[in-house]
């Protein structure tokens, strides 16, 4: 289970473990909380009062300090799992829906034609379609794209990089994705 760590201004910074969240709470770095309580940690006993220390962790925390991520400079890292999630596990050529192990990263302009490995040049393809297209462009292979590639926003990237998002975390993130996002479909 992960905690969504935000800057004090509400920009996503990272997915952190419960233990990392406890460190932020103990260091008084949590400025605000959102979402529900997901864990409760008990510590030692105060020698004077006899009270046990308790830290309750919420699913979303806003922390003090300067944001580590500038949303305007961000270029999300490209991984197959994020690519397949962006494209909803749908082949860009035949439109079939596949399991992740049956999909490939397909370069629209192939490396053989000086194509680059970036979000705007890759789509999800099933193995047969990727093999059929080979080192050709979609036009040369007479295989038109069924959808256009795009670079995920900061908010979409945080959704794409975590498979076990709690409902309140998803609600928070999805409220900020662009209206044109495929993740809303």
What is each model feature region?
Residues 1-75, 80, 146-185:
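Short helix-coil boundary/hinge micro-motifs
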Residues 3-4, 91-93:
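Short, hydrophobic/aromatic-rich beta-strand segments within well-structured domains
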Residues 9, 116, 129-130:
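A generic structural motif
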Residues 10, 83, 141:
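A residue-level signal for conserved active-site and pocket-lining positions in enzyme catalytic cores
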Residues 76, 96-124, 133-149:
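Histidine-centered nuclease catalytic patch
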Residues 81, 87, 95-100:
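Internal, conserved structured core segments that host functional sites
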Residues 84-89, 118-122:
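Short metal-coordination and nucleic-acid-contact micro-motifs, chiefly zinc-binding Cys/His arrays
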Residues 93-94, 128:
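Short, cysteine/histidine-rich loop/knuckle motifs that typically chelate Zn2+
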């Amino acid at each position: 289970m992960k905690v969504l760590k935000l800057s004090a201004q509400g920009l996503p910074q990272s997915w952190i473990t419960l233990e990392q969240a406890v460190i932020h709470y103990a260091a008084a770095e949590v400025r605000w909380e959102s979402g529900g309580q997901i864990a409760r940690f008990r510590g030692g006993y105060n020698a004077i009062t006899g009270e046990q220390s308790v830290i309750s962790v919420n699913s979303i925390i806003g922390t003090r300090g300067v944001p580590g991520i500038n949303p305007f400079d961000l270029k999300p890292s490209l991984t197959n799992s994020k690519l397949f999630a962006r494209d909803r596990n749908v082949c860009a050529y035949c439109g079939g829906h596949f399991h992740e192990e049956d999909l490939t990263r397909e370069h629209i302009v192939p490396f053989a034609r000086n194509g680059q490995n970036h979000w705007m040049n890759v789509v999800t393809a099933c193995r047969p379609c990727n093999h059929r297209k080979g080192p050709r462009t979609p036009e040369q292979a007479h295989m038109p794209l069924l959808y256009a590639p795009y670079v995920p926003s900061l908010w979409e990237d945080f959704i794409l990089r975590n498979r076990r998002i709690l409902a309140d975390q998803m609600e928070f993130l999805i409220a900020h994705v662009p209206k044109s996002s495929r993740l809303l479909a």
